[in-house]
């Protein structure tokens, strides 16, 4: 037995035997129950290998280290093997597991972690101390229970050290040999869950009470500090008040000022002059809900925010003054600035001495802090009034000179039309040029436009539709003294004056028409000269000689009418010769036109002629094919007749005549002779030669 035991402990023979049996597909259960190790080592091996539920290691008589006396090689603080121990036992377990399905057991531990507020650190330390004391007492009890279980033969000493919260359960449990091993994990998890829920309830209640106390204290401090600051600002001059606000803004950015409220912000903005509002950026505007993390948003701030938006908000300035770098400071600043409304008081319409009407902010601040954290700029801009966009349009025009809000409001009230012309709009002062000057010729044109009136032709005066020419009363000339007026209205040259829909009852323009200069005669003469340029050479000559007939009449008259016309009027020889030349050239021109017309007609009809010829050609081809077919039929019939005749003919000896050697020849008297083909061929050759000679 000792030899066998030493052989097994060496791990040689038993390893070879088990390997061979596992490869052969047999599972042999060796009767080694008489050689069981002490129960402590057996239970320790069962726990290390997965518990008693593992069927692969249920019959192992060896310890985890591979021998009987090697239980001391285990690490004292863990289940892992000692690195100095030999790996024979591990190899034995791996070989023994061959051919056996292994299902791993996965254990998941869930831990509920909750944050403790900064102000309740003392209470949290007290709770942690109590928990530590209870865990210490439980650990001692569990150790005692574990030792009793080991003495009983089957307890797990490490199951008692699984957690400090299992102490009560271990003390109440009886000292069974191995019955408590599978249930230790379940009982411990249940007790851990119950105790954690109790601790969470206590922590939540204490945190809630402490938060309420801190909020009330911070509210009182902020109100007192705001009152002091307001009193100081009211007593100091404007420049000292600006310094105070700047220092407060810097203190807010550095995190030292935690009692800045929205009501104080609006009062400071309303107390500052107009010019100082332009330098305030939205990055310096805080909200009460984003100043301190522990501050509850259920504080009672009352300001009517909708009225402030609809009256004194300039969205355009708010967007332009918002810096980009204010959103890159730190995560807390980013979350706080995302809650800031992109709004600012309008510096053009705000009275510096006027305060905000109303003190109700319940419509803006929600009672829950989570709602304030989720509030974005889109939610704030959702309730904006339409008047904001009207103010934006007005402010875009206010930068220009000679701005009149009443006229601009009337301009925005005009309805638009689909054609792009305001046909229903009323005549207002913002129109650039009145109806009397809508067709004016200005000395100051656009860049690259020729301003010399003498270089412009009559085509420049044509109207937009149908070549309309304006009346002389509608034409005016702007003197050089009005250049200042045009300098003020330079930006208005883009607009058009569509006032031709005015009713007769509409008042006439107060502006008097400019005096008509002497250049109108030049324009008219230039127009006449241009029309003369369009005349032909004959018309110009007839006009120069004062011939009382038009060129068309001279050319188109019949011969009798032309001669009578020349006899009725007293004309000089030069006029008569010119008239005859004009008539001759006109007739030649008409003849040439007729010739060209005939040629064009021929060219146009040539295609039809070609088509007709092609059709005729196809008809002739069809007729030729039919004639050839008829000729071939006649030849075939003649050939058949030859064979029939020669089949009936006989020579002197009574033999049939060969049609290949003889041929039939008709004479002039109608008789038929049988002639050899050689003679017929020679006779044809002689005839052909005679024909060639001729």
Swiss-Prot record:
Nucleus found in the keyword field: yes
Gene: NFE2L3
Compositional bias (Low complexity): 133-150
Feature: compositional bias, Polar residues: 333-357
Annotated bZIP domain residues: 578-641
Biased composition (Basic and acidic residues): 193-217, 231-254
GO cellular component: chromatin; nucleus; RNA polymerase II transcription regulator complex
Gene3D superfamilies assigned: Transcription factor, Skn-1-like, DNA-binding domain
Subcellular location per the Swiss-Prot or TrEMBL entry: Nucleus
Tissue specificity of this protein: Highly expressed in human placenta and also in B-cell and monocyte cell lines. Low expression in heart, brain, lung, skeletal muscle, kidney and pancreas.
Annotated function: Activates erythroid-specific, globin gene expression.
Protein name in the entry: Nuclear factor erythroid 2-related factor 3
